[in-house]
Amino acid sequence: MELSIVWMYLGFFLAAYSVIANDSIQTLGTFLSANKNDFPWYTLWFAASLMLIISITYGWYAYDGDISYERLTRIPYQEVQWYHALAPGILLLLTRSGIPVSTTFLVLSAFASVTVLEKMLVKSIVGYGIAAIVAYLVWIIIERIINEKQDHPTHRKFWRVSQWVSSGWLWFAWLQHDMANIAVFLPRQLDLTNLIIVLISTILILGYVFYTGGGLSLIHISEPTRPYWI
C-alpha cells in the first residue's frame, strides 16, 4: 500500500472524528441536552444516524459520487501527505480540550489556495453576521412571549415533534456543508466501497459522541443556556 493512501485514510478518520465531535455537537447539542433525560442515547443516535445516512447517500448519488455536494470544486484532489493529516490532528487536540474552533479553516487551509481561503473568509463573515442578526431578532420576539422563569408542566406533543423535525433539518443542512471538511481527504468520486467505509466510520464516531454525552463541547453549550426549553 502506498504511503499516500495511509495518510489519506488517517487524515479522513482524524477529520471525521474531529469535525463530528466538534461541529455536530454545536449543531445537535441542544437537541441532545433537551432529550437525554427522556430518551436513551442510542435512540437519539439512531435518529441522527438515519439523517446522516440520507444526507451522505443522497450527495453520493446526486453528485456522481461526490459526498461534498460539489463544494470542493475549487480544491482539486491531491495526493495526501503527512502535513495534510496534521491539520485534523491539531483539530482533534483542540476538540478534546473542549475548545470550539473553525474546522473549515483549520482543515481546508492545508489544501486550499490563498484566493479560495479569502472567499471562504468573506462568506463566513457574512453568514455569521446574518445568522447573528436573525437569531437576535427571533430571540427578542420569543422572549416577549415565553417566560422561562415560569414552570411549564404541560408537555405538548407538537413541540416535541417540531423540535425533532427542525433538529433533523439543521443536521441535514450541516452535513451538506461540513462534509467537505471530511471529504477533502478522499477522491472526489467515491466508489461504493469507500462510501460504505465513510458511512460506517461516521456512524460509529457519532455513536461514540452520543454515548459519551457529547463530551466537553456539550458542556460549554449547556452551561450558559437553558437547552431544556428548546
Language model feature labels by segment:
Residues 16-20, 24, 51-63, 87-95, ...:
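Transmembrane alpha-helical segments of multi-pass membrane transport proteins and ion-pumping complexes
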Residues 27, 64-74, 178-190:
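Membrane-interface helix termini and inter-helical loops of multi-pass transporters
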Residues 92-104:
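Membrane-helix interface "capping/anchor" motifs
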Residues 219-230:
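Single conserved hydrophobic/aromatic residue that forms the stacking wall/gate
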